[in-house]
Amino acid sequence: MSSTEAGSPLRLAVIGVGARSYIASHAVDSGSGTIVAVADPSSAARERAAEQFGAGIATFASHRDLIDARDAQGGSIVDAAFVTSPDHTHAEIAIDLLRAGIPVYVEKPLAISLDDADAILAAAAESGTRLYVGHNMRHMAVVTLMRDIIQRGEIGEVKAVWCRHFVGNGGDYYFKDWHAERAKSNGLLLQKGAHDIDIIHWLAGGYSELVTGMGGLSLYGDITDRRDNSDRTMPEWFSLDAWPPLSQTELNPVIDVEDISMVTMRLDNGVYASYQQCHYTPDYWRNYTVIGTEGRLENFGDTDGAVVRVWNTRTTYDPAGDAEYRVNGDERGHRDADRLTVDEFIRFITDGSETETSAVAARNAVATAVAATESIRDGSRPIAVPAVDEHVATLV
């Protein structure tokens, strides 16, 4: 990467100018990169990119055209790329970039099928090109606080992790565009749940080996007011005034994903875990409980000012706990973690620095969520989660 070697800002591409494409701007803000190109099949998105990233950037209708573009020296016009396109396109785009020798930041989830996730890892291993998956919750203050408490031994050895996810903005975020379609997201237990499944694995120190899922389309399927919103982006229709949830309008024409789902997991280190999400709650936050051999912890709130409480003496009902730790930072939820995640990506592709995120862990979050979603749609049948190829895992 010539820009890296010269010490100048990296030349960055953004592929997919949607709701998450703004994350690339963090590299610009830090001075570590400059956005020089975007690719998106939508002409409206390409026009929007000029407003978002500045006039003068190169625009392409296809990521392959961007890959083929050459600079004055005959090399690639970019040093790295952010893939923030719809989930079902991640695999094709990421594999092409990796094979072209362009380091990649892939927005989570890594892919919508296990085969695609494994193919991306294989492409990274075979090409030797650096792959990074944007599991930004590993940089959320509430998560790092809980992990620090665990690693200090305050609750002993972890034996169980429970997460309840109240997705209060679910109607606006996931049921008015492609997220609502199985063909493009697989399901929200993957699209949304991959965040927390990854964190459950991280806090527990293991990966799921057996899962059972349950859930269904319990509310949004009853709303008949539908609209093709492909001419708009989520901020244009988002409103907290859309309450109660059955008053939502202009939902996606196709809705075949679950709006409530849950999964129980047995991990390969003997930890048991569960994750539940509901997309029509009035509030929007996630609540973790981690139980160990010498106590338990629980978070109340997940942004700045929230607290994590620890119980490590025997008692009855005691809401205060034995210790309380305040969450500092993350005033806007995991968006504050985006900056730290992008900074880590830049360091990783520049000098190979160690990362908190892991492409293998991202693959295992996909594997778990895909298996759990299959379980939901097959009568809640327990399903074994395939392990990653050990050789490939050593190379990415």
Locate predicted features.
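Beta-loop-alpha module in the N-terminal Rossmann-like domain of NAD(P)-dependent dehydrogenases
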Residues: 55-123
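N-terminal Rossmann-like dinucleotide-binding module
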Residues: 1-54, 75-76
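C-terminal capping/lid region of NAD(P)-dependent oxidoreductase domains
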Residues: 2, 7, 129, 156-160, ...
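Rossmann-fold dehydrogenase core element
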Residues: 119-136, 156-163
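Hydrophobic residues in well-ordered beta-strands that form the structural core
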Residues: 106, 112, 131-133, 162, ...
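C-terminal glycine/acidic-rich active-site capping loop/insertion
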Residues: 218-262, 266-267, 286-360, 364, ...
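Glycine-rich phosphate/pyrophosphate-binding beta-alpha loops
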Residues: 194, 276-284
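Predominantly a Rossmann-like dinucleotide-binding segment in NAD(P)-dependent oxidoreductases
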Residues: 18, 137-252, 379
